[in-house]
Regions:
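Active-site loop segments of alpha/beta catalytic cores
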Residues: 1-30, 52, 59-67, 104-348
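Residue-level signal for cytosolic alpha-helical hairpin/rod architecture
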Residues: 32, 149-150, 160, 372-376, ...
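Membrane helical hairpin/interfacial module
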Residues: 32-80
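Basic, amphipathic N-terminal segments that precede the first structured/catalytic domain
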Residues: 34-45, 98-115, 306, 398
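Short, solvent-exposed helix-helix connector turns and helix-capping sites enriched
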Residues: 41, 159-160, 386
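Well-ordered mid-protein domain cores that form the structural environment of catalytic cofactors
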Residues: 68-105
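Acidic, low-complexity proline/glycine-rich segments
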Residues: 85-89, 131-148, 353, 358-359, ...
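Long amphipathic alpha-helical segments
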Residues: 350-402
Length: 402
């Protein structure tokens, strides 16, 4: 279980459709009339995402999930920020009337839009795939979207007590918003996030503070760390998005948060992507600190050297896949580490873990030649993205002591 620092997840940021045999006969909706419909019409987006998931590759651990994002940091829009739909994303502009009062209005149209979008997608999914949690964000990043980054940075000096109070207010509202949206999208207790094809067996959240590249370590510990810690204490599974080399000096403060499960590394503009040897020591430090890692935009050529250097436990790989042949190649590489990982011993693999039917890495003990033959159907089922046969073969293998 990757959240518990074991095994490998082989995944990608979102999905690709090229060369993929559809999973269901879902027609594409008529093209959006304009950017407003493309982003802010719940019914149109639900129909589009229904088509999107049906035509996306779901091999390896790529999750069937509808990306319901309403822009990065859409909690700011719920609190009064202004939406603007672009060609490839949604922008959230500061509230022109913001006066430092953090107020949640349950009748705000942007809050109503969040709920209507998720409900429309959930109805369309009908249990066949997950509906992702929007990218709400929190803390300083939300406040910066509401009033402007420069003003927030000034607040760290000019009105730090007010800023601390606002951070707590934003956190309190975050939990209210998160819980209500979770109740819409949940499948049992499980949920998925809109990005990273990321799943958890309970409540999960991606946390961040991109503005932290511009603040000191002391300010981070005052204005960010306590509120991230509170989120980690109240949400079962948490992943911190560490963005850019300018934010690396806050890693010690992150590792101090015992309840934080994992850290995702985004190198930033001008830097090599997440599979580069440049980041091996960073990953080792995070793993040694008791957190799982998520490495992004890893290429096939980088995959084996990365795993050779950092190990194969607690590693979530967001690959740079373009077609299903590349996914299958990566599966074969990862298979070697699943066989050899100490975490894959028979003693450490419970029957319940092996029978898990969601996004848990299926770990197999190192087989002898005869066992290799018996386990071929399992590997083939996983590569083909066929979940139920994979589970069935796993259960049979365990029963036979393979």
């Amino acid at each position: 279980d990757w959240w518990n620092h074991k095994g490998i997840i082989l995944n990608m940021w979102e999905h690709f459709q090229k060369g993929v045999k559809p999973h269901a006969d879902i027609p594409a909706p008529a093209p959006a009339k304009d950017l407003n419909q493309k982003w802010f019409d719940p019914q149109w987006r639900a129909e589009y995402l229904d088509w999107y998931v049906a035509h996306s590759s779901l091999k390896a651990d790529i999750l069937p999930v509808a990306n319901t994002q309403l822009g990065p940091g859409s909690l700011a829009a719920i609190l009064g920020g202004v939406f603007e739909g672009g060609e490839d994303t949604i922008w959230i502009h500061p509230d022109p009337d913001f006066n430092d009062e953090i107020v949640f209005n349950p009748e705000h149209p942007n809050w109503i839009l969040h709920k209507e979008l998720l409900k429309a997608c959930k109805a369309k999914a009908n249990g066949h795939y997950y509906v992702g949690m929007p990218d709400l964000m929190e803390g300083l990043d939300v406040l910066a979207a509401l009033k402007g980054t420069d003003k927030v940075l000034l607040d760290t000096v000019m009105q730090p007590e007010v800023l601390e109070q606002q951070m707590q207010q934003i956190n309190d509202i975050y939990f209210k918003v998160f819980d209500e949206l979770y109740d819409i999208i949940r499948e049992g207790d499980e949920m998925a996030f809109c990005y990273f094809s990321s799943w958890a067996p309970g409540k999960m959240s991606k946390l961040q503070s991109d503005i932290s590249t511009m603040i000191s370590e002391d300010d981070y510990r005052r204005f960010v760390q306590p509120f991230i810690r509170e989120q980690c204490q109240k949400i079962d599974y948490t992943l911190y998005h560490l963005d850019g080399v300018g934010a690396m000096h806050h890693l010690p403060a992150l590792l101090e948060i015992e309840e934080l499960n994992a850290i995702q590394w985004t190198p930033g503009v001008g830097e090599p992507q997440g599979g580069s040897p440049k980041w091996y020591d960073l990953y080792k430090k995070i793993l040694a600190g008791g957190k799982s890692i998520m490495a992004c935009w890893v290429t096939l050529d980088e995959l084996k050297p990365l795993l050779d250097n950092i190990g194969a436990d607690g590693v979530h790989l967001e690959m740079d896949f373009h077609n299903e042949q590349e996914v299958e190649q990566a599966m074969r590489i990862v298979e070697e580490y699943s066989f050899s990982s100490p975490a894959a011993s028979k003693e450490s693999l419970s029957k319940e873990e092996a029978a898990a039917t969601k996004q848990k890495t299926i770990i197999i003990k190192s087989p002898e030649a005869a066992e290799d033959e018996a386990l071929k159907p399992l590997f083939n089922a996983i590569v083909d993205g066929k979940l139920e046969p994979a589970v069935e073969v796993t259960q049979k293998a365990i029963a036979e002591g393979i």
